[in-house]
Amino acid sequence: MSGCNCGSSCNCGDQCKCNKRSGLSYVEAGETTETVVLGVGPTKIHFEGAEMSVAAEDGGCKCGSSCTCDPCNCK
């Protein structure tokens, strides 16, 4: 995946947008706006304060063991 690299604090780079919790992407939400698209497929949404986590799609950048990105394979 181009542009996918490991950043600081054991997470993938800015374009990967993943933290140590594999399979989750984090998007900072400055406002409480929600858009729902129906009929596309199942989506898991969890609101926690101003942070929203959405399950990543298959093939997305996930953080693996030893602070490496998988499938980015950054070391």
UniProtKB/Swiss-Prot annotation:
One GO MF term attached to the UniProt entry: metal ion binding
Does the keyword Metal-binding belong to this entry?
yes
Q: Which UniProt keywords apply?
A: Metal-binding, Metal-thiolate cluster
| Coiled-coil stretches noted in the UniProt entry, renumbered to this chain | none
Q: Which domain of life is it from?
A: Eukaryota
Read off the InterPro entries from this record: Metalthion_15p
A Pfam family that the UniProt record links to this protein:
Metallothio_2
**What does it do?**
Metallothioneins have a high content of cysteine residues that bind various heavy metals.
Q: Which family does it belong to?
A: Belongs to the metallothionein superfamily. Type 15 family.
Question: Would you tell me the protein name for this molecule?
Answer: Metallothionein-like protein 1
